[in-house]
Structure formats: structure tokens, C-alpha cells
């Protein structure tokens, strides 16, 4: 029984190796021609046109990401970063304080009012004294 399982394992590995080698050989990019030089086409894009014809690729390839600086600033300069909220996207009314309010005590007076409000005091959101 162990020898039969060993034979099955060896044969399955052989079949997998055979399938893997034929799929690598079928790859259209595995050619003998030079990567940057083509003798039958003139111009810079001769190889790209040849590869497009061989693989049926239609259209242009996407550009790779560029990590060049978008601005023409010197490397020693830092970009100006605005401080505070953007007035275009965050409209702040003139009567609102510039800093968030700090509460001296909790919105509820004591723990008993929160635990058992009774019928006259329903549970709801805490009262906010100052809103933006």
C-alpha cells in the first residue's frame, strides 16, 4: 500500500512538473529577441508593436507610477501647510468659540439620575451647552 502511494505521488509530481514547463514555454514574452532592439521595425516602439501583434494586445500600456516631485521647489524648501480648519470646507460661525468647549462637570448631575431617570425624566442624549 505504501509503495502504491509513493508511486502515485511521484507520478503526480512528474505530471505537475510537465504541465508547469509547458505553460512557461507557451508564454509569448519568452522569445529569443532582444528586449530593446528590433531588426525588422524602425523606431523606438518597434518591439512594443511586435509584442502587441504577437499577443493580441490592443491599446497602450498603463504608465508606471512616477515618484518625481510635482512642484519645482528646491529639495531644501518645505511645502507650506495651512494651520487650522479650512474655511471653504468647514464654515465656522463668527459667534462660535475657536476652541472646543471643556466641561467642568459631567452633563448629568449624578449617577442616580442616569441609572433611574423615572417617568418624568426620559433617557436621551446628554445636553450640549455649546455647539459649533
UniProtKB/Swiss-Prot annotation:
Biased composition annotated in UniProt, kind: Pro residues? 123-132
Q: Which residues are glycosylated?
A: 85
Which GO annotations describe the biological process of this protein?
Answer: cell-cell signaling involved in cell fate commitment
* Keywords on record: Developmental protein, Differentiation, Glycoprotein, Hydroxylation, Secreted, Signal
Protein family (similarity comment): Belongs to the CLV3/ESR signal peptide family.
Instruction: Report the residues modified as Hydroxyproline.
Output: 82, 85
| Leader sequence segment | 1-26
Single GO term (MF): receptor serine/threonine kinase binding
Q: Which InterPro entries match?
A: CLV3/ESR (IPR044962)
This chain's protein is named: CLAVATA3/ESR (CLE)-related protein ESR2
